[in-house]
């Protein structure tokens, strides 16, 4: 057991709690944006250790890079990160983003509602604009160019970001992972016009020509870890796409009536909505939690009964003895 005592010796450091919770300059900028969106920290930026000319290092540099251990309480939504358990489909999609030659090579970051990309490397794309860094961005064109090519942690805004939830007029059935991989890696795929589904929805034929309209936004009324409430106003029968993971245990209610959740675009959720105004509520209500709760309560009751009966057995002989002596 002595080896366990020395495990991770000097691995966990200590510092002032208030200083640990202070926001860096980059997180302050992200927090100032009131919209619903996610960030994405470039994989090489997350892993890379650099010597900053500004002298920034340690925890201060980690804050500016939005490393996972520093963004939890800041309520900044990250499209990637380190989790105890991860869905295979999610990991597959993130891997496509990581190996893509450029950030705009696919529609995946747009699809994941990524508005800002954190990167040390310059993103040379008309779809991305350098908007912030913890070091002031030079206004002089030549100095700005040098800054873009530096190793400073920079924030790029994605001009093609797609909303967290929106209405889509058409769908396409995909029957294999290879098909998904081919389509999702293609820049031609437009998630605002067509939703990729595993199966065709009842009463909603995929592939039929439908009148294409401009992107139909959806209002997010409430957003919590275990529930999301939306307001939808659709001019016709469409698919409501939600850039959230498809996962067992999630249920959806349209105007209080439970509906089917479809797996959409390989990883996310979609439902069919009728014309008109609707109140939509996604709710995490897994059977496994209810089963676990029932087992826990039953176990507590059985243990309580056991200990009560055991205590009564110990008291009984004493009572008999006292009565006999009276």
Q: Across the structure, where does each feature detected by a protein language model lie?
A:
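Conserved luminal/periplasmic juxtamembrane motif of membrane-embedded glycan-processing enzymes
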Residues: 1-216, 223-229, 237, 241-245, ...
């Amino acid at each position: 057991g002595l080896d366990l005592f020395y495990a991770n010796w000097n691995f966990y450091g200590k510092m002032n709690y208030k200083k640990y919770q202070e926001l860096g300059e980059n997180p302050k900028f992200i927090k100032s944006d009131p919209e619903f969106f996610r960030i994405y920290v470039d994989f090489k930026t997350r892993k890379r250790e650099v010597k900053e000319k500004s002298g920034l290092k340690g925890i201060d540099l980690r804050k500016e890079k939005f490393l996972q251990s520093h963004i939890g309480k800041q309520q900044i939504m990250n499209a990637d990160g380190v989790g105890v358990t991860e869905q295979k489909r999610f990991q597959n999609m993130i891997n496509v983003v990581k190996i893509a030659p450029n950030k705009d090579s696919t529609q995946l970051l747009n699809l994941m509602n990524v508005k800002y990309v954190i990167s040390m490397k310059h993103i040379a794309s008309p779809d991305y604009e350098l908007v912030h860094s913890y070091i002031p961005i030079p206004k002089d064109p030549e100095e700005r160019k040098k800054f873009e090519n530096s190793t400073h942690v920079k924030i790029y805004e994605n001009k093609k970001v797609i909303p967290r939830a929106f209405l889509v007029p058409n769908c396409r059935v995909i029957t294999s992972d290879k098909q998904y991989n081919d389509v999702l890696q293609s820049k031609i795929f437009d998630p605002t016009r067509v939703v990729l589904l595993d199966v065709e929805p009842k009463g909603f034929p995929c592939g039929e020509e439908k009148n294409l309209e401009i992107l139909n936004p959806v209002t997010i009324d409430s957003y919590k870890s275990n529930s999301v409430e939306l307001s939808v106003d659709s001019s016709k029968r469409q698919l409501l796409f939600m850039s959230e993971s498809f996962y067992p245990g999630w249920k959806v209610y349209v105007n209080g009536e439970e509906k089917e959740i479809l797996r959409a675009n390989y990883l996310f959720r979609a439902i069919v909505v009728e014309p008109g105004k609707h109140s939509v509520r996604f709710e995490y209500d897994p059977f496994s939690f209810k089963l676990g709760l029932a087992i826990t309560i039953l176990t507590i009751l059985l243990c309580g009964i056991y200990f009560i009966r055991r205590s009564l057995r110990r008291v009984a002989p004493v009572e008999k003895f006292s009565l006999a002596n009276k």
